[in-house]
Amino acid sequence: MLTLDTLNVMLAVSEEGMVEEMILALLASPQLVIFFEKFPRLKNAVTADLPRWREALRSRLKDARVPQKLTEEVMCYQQSQLLSTPQFIVQLPQILALLHRLHSPYAAQAKQLVESNSTFTPSLHTLFLQRWRLSLVVQATTLNQQLLEEEREQLLSDVQERMTLSGQLEPTLAENDNAAGRLWDMSAGQLKRGDYQLIVKYGEFLAAQPELKQLAEQLGRSREAKSVPKKDAPMETFRTLVREPATVPEQVDGIQQSDDILRLLPPELATLGITELEYEFYRRLVEKQLLTYRLHGEAWREKVTERPVVHQDVDKQPRGPFIVCVDTSGSMGGFNEQCAKAFCLALMRVALADNRRCFIMLFSTEVVRYELSGPEGIEQAIRFLSQRFRGGTDIASCFRAIIERMQRRKWFDADAVVISDFIAQRLPDDVVSKVGELQRLHQHRFHAVAMSAHGKPGIMRIFDHIWRFDTGMRSRLLRRWRR
């Protein structure tokens, strides 16, 4: 069976303009406009998806099959082009019968054209084929538009689902444009509303515990380089780009009258296939009165200013991935569990903003792993937040898992974060020795987030930094009173 791509090539129909028109119409839809106004950070992330959308639409048009009736008509047209005028006159009754049988839009016009001329001349032969081809072009264009409309509805439905998900999670997980882009990429998974509401719930809990959120941000960015500007610096030229309006065709701004065929409205194109309106279409084309999409865009202009030269002495330190180990023993249940999960969510937020990896390991009697910064990060985060802290405490296994992962090439600059109340047995000497070696030779940093004031000093002595967040009732009341 004939493919739509082959038909477009045969009739010289360009689908590129229709694809671009559909993309522009999609971007101009009220749903996306409102979404971009509400979540401006996600606009760039959605825009970055446009090449993938275009490729998917082209692939859909390329693989689509042409209906059998249209295929037969196209084949008949192709064969008729090879006939001379005398041969064509002989085959004309069969051609008219075929057009009638196929219910071709050109059937009535072809019959009228033959009956209104007693003599079938070569010029009439040429006119017959030209109008037949025009009818086929209109049919092919209509078929392309029908398929694109179906794809637009499906694409809009998918985008709306992802917008709902991203919009719900943006306040919790998207700190900057980079995080918004990664969050949009993660939203491509199959998630239900009830699933990601768990992240929203812990995001609200984190917002109600500003000290916990601040602690996570301090820990996550504790490796930031320190810079000291020098004084009495000379002036230097500083160039910046300033945005200003332009006429670059970037997004739909309305409707105008012109002769731009590529941006023609579908109702205008439909008049081309109606015999009574055909000459009216060409008249309006010549007079530039066809209704088309009006586009506008933005341009950048270079602005030159003078400012003092600022040199900075920077002690750069690498900012690698997080390996977070969470104690899921029974003593970490209740409010401790909520704080530990919310703290991991805050670290995930930092990782997304700084383009870092965030790997979670739960330790009790066994080690369970989740990667919150991968393509399936949202699903992994939901699984992690769904866990219950009811196991035992095997902190030695946790450290062995950290050591084993840090020895891999991809994790050579990772930071380890252990979240626990540190009410556990002392660590074996071989584990303590290996941790010290990683700290000394490879500059790995080990952070402890202590959820209790009663953690054993012997365990916590091996950490580079100890971040305390006491979850006792007295400390909770004091924090609430200070707010």
Curated annotation (Swiss-Prot):
Keywords attached to this entry: Chaperone, Cytoplasm
SUPFAM superfamilies in alphabetical order: vWA-like (SSF53300)
UniProt key word Cytoplasm: yes
Assigned GO CC terms: cytosol
SMART domains: VWA (SM00327)
Xref: InterPro entries: Uncharacterised_CoxE, Uncharacterised_ViaA, VWF_A, vWFA_dom_sf
Entry's localization field: Cytoplasm
CDD domains per the UniProt record, alphabetical: VWA_YIEM_type (cd01462)
PANTHER family hit by this protein: PROTEIN VIAA (PTHR36846:SF1)
Family, per entry: Belongs to the ViaA family.
NCBIfam families with a match to the protein in the record: PRK10997.1
Subunit: Homodimer. Interacts with RavA.
Task of the protein: Component of the RavA-ViaA chaperone complex, which may act on the membrane to optimize the function of some of the respiratory chains. ViaA stimulates the ATPase activity of RavA.
Protein name: Regulatory protein ViaA
